[in-house]
């Protein structure tokens, strides 16, 4: 066939995008197209009889062929399903076949309207060949699908404007049909690119992902392709790719003595190679095309993490029946055509899912992963803690952040080293902290389905902890939770499922335990204080901070709220031990009062009525009234518990003994309200001597001591029930009702006040004893309070700072130390060291600087500047003597002073100025007073001005530091003499401490630790260390 050199045919609308390309490339591509189509036509002409003969003789062999080796292999899934729906009856096939052949010839005529006569004759020959092929009965199904898809594809091409000049449908089809002459490959081992070819045109249904100028071009022959898949096929067939980048890069020297542009190009290439790296073998590539060919050639895409579409979650979370349905509906990998062709009915069900997968991905990666991911994403994007499915990764991330499930999953996995999905400790911890109290509050309503479900799941959880079968029961519970949904594939499409932890209904009925920030803070602080008190080892120097993210070993998280919060030290007095079994058997009814303040925190004060309704299920009049009264009268209501304790001590003691005896039996039985309430009061009426072991109460007591508010040690009655006090503390702090210490002793409370409020609702037709005990419990919850919320976090931060293992004041110790000594104890642990003055206590990095300290530092810095002969001032460093003087006088550590100096120097070098000093880079500084904003030109005048603010001269600072030192040492000797009596207690705490610092009486495990302490804290040089260290045993 003669070659056309310069004459280009007029393009149809579908080719409008190509006009942006250069003229030479168009001509070159068209020449290649002519050569290819000519050679193909000649091949076809020579092979026509053979092809027909083969079709008639080898029909059985081709009937069993996979679609991937047939001319229909470029069909997308949707095309294939349409085809399978249309090709049911043979008469229907024959009717549509004639129509389609006419349509196809019309299309050909309309697409190439101005072709020369040679091309027309060539196309006529090919039309005759195809008519002959398609008339054969064995080809009816495939022929129909082929002709339909070609016409549809032409429609889509003209609509999207995304076809290319060097692609011709009949040439492509011919090359596919010529493949039938090759020896047939086995269906079980498909060709390397079968899945790629199967999806070849699917992206054109919904438009290409890469539109506009970002066409995929082969870098060696400049052939342009619409999709990366087509370019990858081309590169694999022609070998136009590089697979040895890593070896080349090692040999190539990296020299940048090139022109600037070349050097930047090489840098870009290196950056690309850092990104375009095979995740399996680590080879890096210059281009995305090379990487994709490498992945498909080596099958490394199968070994990349997350390749498997259905994780192990599905086998554990889905019931067998649902799993069978899911397996039937889930299409197999695109290589095998049975998944979508065998059954035409799943097509409408999964249509939206598959369409979205086309829109988002377009099968650009050439593998089956994306498609299977879309089909199975309800199983993949599933919270490993609670099993909820999500549509997108973003939704799953939001869910885990809001509910805090990421913390529980990761912490439990790192702790236990188990499979993440079903870690029972994390599951139980989450359930006991959120689900258990909430669902318990709904338990008395058997009429509502949600309440019964929750009750079932809660009892299941309790049974789980006792029978040691967490895996099976957890699976049952997951099944129970997922019973409501018809099919796992439908889950992400259900709008109510996406935000199941944020809906108002769930917050109201409390069945899901929503994501509450205060609750998570409370859990964190609780665990932190537990770990600090127990002295459990941790992996860094800050046990109380990091311990918040560990699961305590002694905790049984699946028990109700009280037992989770309650952490009892084994070395406590014997009389304290019965508290644990009591709270293990605290029945379902007593929890709603503890829940009331908690839900109040969640929903803010406007929802008081809802909360009262919610927790009033068991005895509506009584509980609602008690809660509303406790809300309205929260000021005076902090007193009554003591009176209730005095009113009925004897029966409660008897109840105590009964509880000890029958604790184990009652675990499995729900207890009546009356006994449960008296159980609740049994804690309140416990002997006044032992301390409260509730961690948050301990936190409150140490907070009060730390802030100087407390004069008395914390006694047990002030915070009776762990569950109620835990919630009430944060409830009260959020409302900011009162800022007075909770430690006022029981004896000072007037009896009249408490009686007035105890019998306030005696007009109600209920038992007064029950009312009294209920009242005591609810007001008990109110009595355990904290300062307003704005101070709470900073106080907790300060509290955590002073909780290292060796220096934590334990509750057991504090109960035996008189109040004055306890206060001294806390001050000793926190502040009293030789360099700290009583006026200026160190607060740590978060606090603002003491202005006097800043003035001293600025004056010393200004005095260190020296003047050159030219009159310019230059920076110099403060010597160790000056730093020591500042440290001794201000109480700042040497490290803090060095950091301040380094920061000032850095700012001066970088910007030429800092807050109190400008124009330093020009050599003529201007000094600013931070107190009165005056300006000075010379250091001497600036220093004298600062001295006027300070009230003393800098040269007197040494003398004042010595006087201050003697004062502090006197105070230390006084404190240490006062501490002689509880020395035995300190010995109990610091069993492994062997050495002691003479200056501040702190004990250390090794001599090295004492020397470090002397250097850092007291600024003592190493030669003097020996005289300040003593052995604890010698004393």
UniProtKB/Swiss-Prot annotation:
Residues 1-92, 240-266, 432-496, 600-674, 764-791, 968-987, 1015-1035 are annotated as: Disordered. There is a cross-link at residues 189, 307, 316, 418, 462, 481, 498, 602, 801, 821 (Glycyl lysine isopeptide (Lys-Gly) (interchain with G-Cter in SUMO2)). It is found in: Nucleus. Residues 39-49, 66-92 have a biased composition (Polar residues). Residues 21-37 have a biased composition (Acidic residues). The modification Phosphoserine is found at residue 981. One of its GO terms (molecular function) is zinc ion binding. Residues 432-450, 968-977 have a biased composition (Low complexity). GO terms for cellular component: nucleus. Residues 460-483, 601-669 have a biased composition (Basic and acidic residues). Probable transcriptional regulator involved in developmental processes. May act as a transcriptional repressor (Potential). This is Teashirt homolog 2. It comes from Sus scrofa. The gene is TSHZ2.
């Amino acid at each position: 066939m003669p070659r056309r050199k310069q004459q280009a045919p007029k393009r149809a609308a579908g080719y409008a995008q190509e006009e942006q390309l250069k003229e030479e490339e168009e001509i070159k591509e068209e020449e290649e197209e002519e050569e290819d189509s000519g050679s193909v036509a000649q091949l076809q002409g020579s092979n026509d009889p053979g092809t027909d003969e083969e079709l008639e003789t080898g029909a059985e062999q081709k009937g069993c062929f996979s679609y991937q080796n047939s001319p229909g292999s470029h069909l997308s899934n949707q095309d294939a399903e349409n085809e399978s729906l249309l090709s049911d009856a043979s008469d229907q096939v024959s009717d549509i076949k004639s129509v389609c052949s006419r349509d196809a010839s019309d299309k050909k005529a309309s697409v190439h309207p101005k072709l020369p006569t040679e091309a027309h004759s060539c196309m006529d020959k090919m039309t005759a060949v195809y008519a002959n092929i398609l008339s054969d009965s064995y080809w009816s199904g495939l022929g129909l699908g082929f002709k339909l898809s070609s016409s549809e594809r032409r429609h889509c091409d003209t609509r999207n404007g995304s076809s290319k000049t060097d692609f011709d449908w009949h040439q492509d089809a011919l090359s596919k049909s010529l493949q039938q002459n090759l020896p047939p490959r086995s269906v079980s081992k498909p060709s390397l690119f079968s899945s790629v070819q199967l999806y070849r045109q699917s992206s054109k249904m919904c438009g290409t992902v890469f539109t506009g100028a970002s066409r995929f071009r082969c870098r060696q022959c400049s052939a342009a392709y619409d999709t990366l898949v087509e370019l990858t096929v081309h590169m694999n067939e022609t070998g136009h790719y590089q697979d040895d980048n890593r070896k080349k890069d090692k040999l190539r020297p990296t020299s940048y003595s090139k022109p600037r542009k070349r050097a930047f190009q090489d840098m870009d290439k290196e950056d690309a190679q850092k990104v375009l790296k095979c995740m399996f073998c680590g080879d890096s590539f210059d281009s995305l095309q090379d990487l994709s060919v490498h992945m498909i050639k080596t099958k490394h895409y199968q070994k990349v993490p997350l390749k498997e579409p259905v994780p192990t979650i599905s086998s554990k979370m889905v019931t067998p029946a649902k799993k069978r349905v899911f397996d039937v509906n889930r299409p197999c990998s695109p290589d095998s055509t049975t998944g979508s062709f065998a059954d035409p009915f799943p097509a409408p069900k999964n249509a939206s899912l598959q369409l979205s997968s086309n829109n988002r991905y377009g099968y650009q990666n050439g593998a089956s992963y994306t498609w299977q991911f879309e089909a199975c994403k309800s199983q993949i994007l599933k919270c490993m803690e609670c099993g909820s499915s999500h549509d997108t990764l973003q939704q799953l991330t939001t869910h885990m952040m809001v509910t805090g499930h990421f913390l529980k999953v990761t912490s439990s996995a790192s702790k236990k080293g188990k499979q993440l999905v079903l870690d029972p400790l994390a599951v139980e911890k989450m359930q006991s902290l959120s689900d258990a109290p909430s669902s318990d509050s709904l338990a008395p309503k058997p009429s509502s389905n949600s309440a019964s479900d929750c009750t079932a799941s809660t009892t299941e959880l309790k049974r789980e902890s006792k029978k040691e079968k967490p895996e099976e029961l957890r699976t049952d519970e997951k099944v129970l939770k997922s019973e409501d949904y018809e099919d796992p594939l439908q889950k992400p499409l259900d709008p109510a499922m996406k935000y199941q932890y944020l809906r108002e209904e769930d917050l109201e009925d409390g069945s899901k335990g929503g994501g509450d920030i205060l609750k998570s803070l409370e859990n964190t602080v609780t665990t932190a204080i537990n770990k600090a008190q127990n002295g459990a080892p941790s992996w860094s120097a800050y046990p109380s901070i990091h311990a918040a993210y560990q699961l305590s070993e002694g905790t049984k998280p699946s028990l109700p709220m009280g037992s989770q919060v309650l952490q009892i030290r084994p070395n406590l007095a014997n009389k304290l031990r019965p508290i644990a079994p009591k709270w293990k058997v605290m029945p379902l009814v007593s929890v709603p009062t503890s829940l009331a303040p908690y839900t109040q925190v969640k929903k803010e004060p406007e929802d008081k009525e809802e909360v009262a309704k919610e927790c009033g299920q068991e005895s509506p009049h009584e509980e609602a009234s008690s809660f509303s009264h406790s809300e309205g009268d929260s000021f005076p209501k902090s007193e009554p518990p003591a009176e209730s304790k005095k009113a009925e001590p004897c029966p409660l003691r008897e109840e105590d003994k009964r509880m000890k005896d029958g604790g184990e039996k009652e675990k499995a039985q729900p207890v009546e309200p009356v006994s449960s309430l008296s159980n609740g009061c049994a804690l309140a009426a416990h002997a006044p001597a032992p301390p409260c072991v509730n961690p948050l109460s301990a936190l409150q007591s140490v907070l009060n001591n730390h802030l100087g508010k407390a004069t008395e040690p914390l006694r047990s009655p002030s915070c009776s029930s762990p569950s109620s006090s835990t919630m009430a503390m944060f409830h009260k702090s959020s409302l900011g009702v009162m800022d007075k210490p909770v430690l006022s002793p029981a004896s000072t409370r007037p009896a009249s006040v408490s009686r007035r409020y105890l019998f306030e609702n005696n007009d109600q037709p209920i038992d007064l004893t029950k009312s009294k005990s209920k009242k005591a419990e609810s007001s008990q919850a109110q009595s355990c309070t904290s300062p307003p919320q704005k101070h709470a976090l900073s106080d907790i931060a300060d509290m955590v700072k002073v909780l290292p293992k060796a220096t934590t004041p334990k509750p057991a110790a504090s109960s035996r130390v008189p109040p004055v000594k306890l206060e001294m104890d806390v001050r000793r642990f926190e502040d009293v060291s030789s360099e700290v003055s009583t006026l200026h206590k160190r607060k740590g990095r978060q606090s603002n600087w003491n202005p006097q300290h800043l003035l001293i530092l600025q004056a010393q810095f200004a005095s260190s500047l020296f003047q050159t002969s030219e009159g310019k001032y230059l920076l110099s460093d403060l010597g160790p003597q000056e730093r020591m003087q500042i440290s001794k006088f201000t109480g700042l550590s040497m490290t803090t002073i060095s950091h301040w100096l380094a920061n000032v120097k850095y700012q001066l070098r970088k910007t030429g100025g800092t807050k109190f000093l400008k124009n330093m880079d020009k050599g003529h500084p201007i000094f600013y007073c931070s107190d009165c904003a005056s300006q000075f030109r010379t250091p001497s005048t600036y220093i004298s001005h600062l001295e006027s603010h300070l009230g003393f001269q800098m040269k007197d600072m040494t003398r004042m530091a010595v006087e201050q030192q003697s004062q502090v040492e006197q105070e230390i000797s006084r404190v240490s003499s006062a501490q002689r009596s509880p020395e035995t207690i300190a010995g109990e705490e610091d069993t492994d401490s062997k050495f002691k610092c003479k200056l501040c009486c702190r004990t250390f495990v090794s001599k090295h630790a004492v020397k470090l302490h002397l250097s850092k804290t007291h600024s003592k040089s190493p030669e003097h260390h020996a005289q300040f260290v003593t052995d604890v045993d010698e004393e």
